[in-house]
Amino acid sequence: MSTTVIKFFMSKSFRTFLKHTAKDFHNQSVNPPVVRASTIIFKSMREIRKMQNKAIKNPKGGYFDYARSGTSTTYILQKILTKLEESYHVFTTQTGFGSVFLAIFSVVRPGDEILVADPVYNPTRVLTENYLKEFNIKTIFYDPHNLETLQKNITPKTKLIFVENPGSNTFDFQDLNKIISIAKKNKVYTAIDNTWGTPYYLKPIK
C-alpha cells in the first residue's frame, strides 16, 4: 500500500510530496486509516512464527505480530519519513526525546565517551551530563564554533558526536560537513537532533 504511494511520488517536489503522500490508493481513501491495535490476530501459532521470521529478515518493517513492532499506520509513517529524510530507513519512537535516548544508547557502552554540542536541548544535556555518568559514560561539551577543540577532545574512547543544527538554546548553525569529516577521520559515529531544521530545511544524511 504505502510502497505504491512512495513510488508514485518519487519524482515530485518536496511540497507536492507533502500534499499527496498520504493518499491511500489501495483502500481508495483520502488518507491511510489510523490503526489502533495492541494485539494482532492470527489463525494459528504457525502463522505467528511466519510473521516473526519475516520481520527478522526484513528490518525495514511491514510485518507485525504485536503493537511494539508497529501497525500499518506506523509503517506508512516510517516510509514517508524515510523519503523525506532521504535515508535508508526510519524507526519511529513514542516521543522525540525517546529517539535521542535510543540514538545515544545504541552506540555507547560503559567506559565510552561522547561529545555533545554545548547549545544542545536542555533535557539532552541533563541526560548526557547527569545520567550517563551513572553508566560510567563520560560526556564532553564542545563549542560548535571552535571545532579545533572538538578534534582535541576526541580520544580512543570517543564513540559519538551529538549535534543539533540549529542549536536549541542559541539557534546557531554548525559546520556539519566539517564535523562529519572529523568524525569519519577518527571513526566516530555522529547523531543529530534535527527537530528545528526538519527535513524541509535540513537533510543531514544527504
Question: Which ranges hold each PLM region?
Answer:
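Alpha-helix initiation/capping motif
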Residues: F25-N27, Y66, G70, D143
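N-terminal glycine-rich, Lys/His-bearing helix-loop that initiates the first secondary-structure elements
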Residues: V5-G61
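Conserved N-terminal alpha-helix of the aminotransferase class I/II PLP-enzyme fold
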Residues: S44-G98, T128-N130
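Conserved PLP-enzyme active-site core in the AAT-like
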Residues: I6, R15-A22, H89-K206
